[in-house]
Amino acid sequence: PNAEHHYFSDASIYLHVTAPGATLSSSMFDLKKEFALAEHGYDFGVRLPWRESFQKLYDSLLTPDGGGIVIAHPSWSHHPISYLEMLLDSDPRILGIEVFNNCSRIDYSDVSEDLWDAILSSGRQCFGFFVVDHPRPNRNWLGRIVLLPEERTAESCLRAMRRGRFYGAISGNGLRFEYIHFDGHMLTAACNRPVEFQLISKIGVINDITFGTKFHFEFPEADREKHTFLRLTAKEGNEIEKLYAQPFILTD
């Protein structure tokens, strides 16, 4: 289950969230009034304070230790970094942000990597989501996440999402991470096809791009505070596919 929640009564900013795992449908989204729902008493938007609405979403989660809230299209909504940090600090069940939202491409605001890195540079954990948003027929829609659950059940998938056991992909053409492992000192990864690996931290790209199917990086303990976080990407060709691993936070 999932639903989009928006138009909170106390939000002076264009806040949209999704809530994977929540069973509550808080409002309708008849944006173009195609279904005349407002005429039948269905409000457009939540019309509740966001904290109250978020608590209703938490209370409705399919499993209490899985799923949560994702902040939608932050670049399209022009969210200030301070506002995003405030939301993330309010509850650990706010999982992260949409780093890629294909529907926002029409406004040239589909990618939010800079916002993601800015949040991670503060030492906050923030998972990255890659989504289609509103698909239409006969379009090459992009954006998806690959969950790594322990079991093929909805509850296990939601727990994997809560724990960051997933990675992002743009086109979904079969490229995948075979493994990603970080023990605090060594980061290793592998893909099923040759790619360009790129490691990113607070200071930007670390070292040169690595070409091939395997990646390794030995992390100096003295550099922990300088980097704050590590996240790995794997790119196949030009505009063919790109994978995004979830970040490792290096600070307490």
Q: Residue ranges of each PLM-predicted region?
A:
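A metal-dependent hydrolase metal-coordination microenvironment
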Residues: 1-68, 72, 99-115, 131, ...
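Active-site regions of enzymes building and remodeling cell-envelope glycoconjugates
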Residues: 2, 17-18, 95, 144-145, ...
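Extracellular/periplasmic catalytic domains that process cell-envelope and extracellular macromolecules
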Residues: 10-13, 62-63, 88-92, 121-123
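Histidine/acidic-residue-rich catalytic or RNA/ligand-binding cores of hydrolases
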Residues: 12-17, 79-90, 108-113, 136-151, ...
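Glycine/proline-rich, flexible active-site/cofactor-binding loop segments
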Residues: 64-102
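C-terminal functional module detector
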Residues: 65, 122-127, 132-252
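Short, well-ordered alpha-helical segments in soluble proteins
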Residues: 98-104, 123, 165
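Short, hydrophobic/aliphatic alpha-helical segments
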Residues: 111-125
